[in-house]
């Protein structure tokens, strides 16, 4: 009763208290964010979600390295932490991000999303606008599962429901550089797409734009998008920022990584971008009010040599001309629209989304440049120098080497989408890469967005079917479909047929599970501590028991397989030794024949020739047969051996005796009651 009252009061407290997503404080000076990056990392294909349990404890070999991310408490920055096999996702949050006026900053979900992200522990969080300054949630590599679709965008009105997990992973390149600051701005990685997260209208500000998940300053009146500079432009009002409770670290130390060492990791970045993009002399995002479900893309810091081939440096003179043509034409776009932001490298395409096409504000020269770049399978880069720092650079083409960047600039790449016909229908999410990815039975899909451009080392197993094959949007242009790769295909492994012989015979290599689930002391204590929780406790105990039974079956299967393998090995050795004995005897007879004129082999060699090769094949065969009999012997007897009171039959006998005694006691009590009733009454 006390436990029930405690749980009810706890639920009421959680329901009435809104936990802020972060603390907002008015301050004109930006702060460094204390990033905690630690823990062993796992192979992405081995990271699965099984119910409430993370499985997979293998040392990661480059480039697929990941660490888990869950929701974050007030004042605590996102952390990369170590997770072990069997660890549970205990803390997930409903997320509602709003601006100071209370307007939601999240995008509307695509029409094909039917299910919501789910967590075991539910808390409702509301926060103010995190986009102007500071970071609320880290979007690079943060994946929210919507009905088999792993998206990097949280959608408006989609809530967490108890029962599943919202899983998030990043690679080591991202979590080393996510909060880094240095010199003129934040260090960014050279990935393949850059995009704004939300676009909204706020009074006189025609196009308030911010970057979700990026530490940045922006001038809302000038519509800068994710372009931090050394001296942030002033905002009309006090700028909010994160008020941290942890001690800030020297972020410049996080920047001392060798860019070349991260080349392999770029193939599996959290944003799902796997290709290297040609860098430019000075890159900034275009002023076209774009919005996408992809996270903000970092770029390398200034004067950093980049790895890659066939890089093309675009002229900035054309960029300046484009700036003049576009400064007066700012398209208006609802905050929920999304657009394709993809990079058509030589043979790779990015995961992207389509929505209602934008208004075409570029001139004919820009469109022709886009068409030419698409025909040469190179991304069309449209750059714009930051406000107040117009710079020009020399135009070079088809040149390898480090990019020369102007001061106060940040490399952020945008690939302009090809012109699309006018349409008001919102298109569905689709994928630009075809992958056959195995979804093992009992597991949730391991983070589609992070593996979309990553190499898949395993092939689909037989007896599988396609469960998700999203076709490209019907509104996509012909040029875009021409460059698009086949669509992604997920496969789901069937459960074994119950009619098949699935016993742990150990006769084949695949009969037994190669892994044993060893529970740690902490997990034992956790299971014991959670066993009292209603509904969840029995599940924990059932999981624990199921794992123990599975371990026992695996051990039995392994022993049988060991016996079978030992018997087979002995049979092979017996055959080899028998053949060698036969060949030795034949050779000895041949030698005796050749040495007959000299009195035979023993006459020549003396006593050393008296060596007999004993035939022990019969004994070995008997031992092999005994191993097979022991391996096939089942413990189905009544246990009559040993002490009778401890054997199976003895236990049954004891139970029978207790039952008879109980009946006798009941009869005696009944008789006593009657006697008392007769004489006393």
UniProtKB/Swiss-Prot annotation:
Further details from the record: Filoviruses entry requires functional lipid rafts at the host cell surface. Essential for infectivity, as it is the sole viral protein expressed at the virion surface.
Provenance organism: Lake Victoria marburgvirus (strain Musoke-80) (MARV)
Keywords: Cleavage on pair of basic residues, Disulfide bond, Fusion of virus membrane with host endosomal membrane, Fusion of virus membrane with host membrane, Glycoprotein, Host cell membrane, Host membrane, Host-virus interaction, Lipoprotein, Membrane, Palmitate, Signal, Transmembrane, Transmembrane helix, Viral attachment to host cell, Viral envelope protein, Viral penetration into host cytoplasm, Virion, Virus entry into host cell
UniProt region (Disordered), positions on chain: 223-427
Disulfide bonds: 37-610, 92-119, 211-226, 512-557, 602-609
Primary gene name: GP
Extracellular-side segments: 19-648
Lipidation (S-palmitoyl cysteine): 671, 673
Region described as Receptor-binding: spans on this chain: 38-188
Residue intervals passing through the bilayer: 649-669
Name of the protein: Envelope glycoprotein
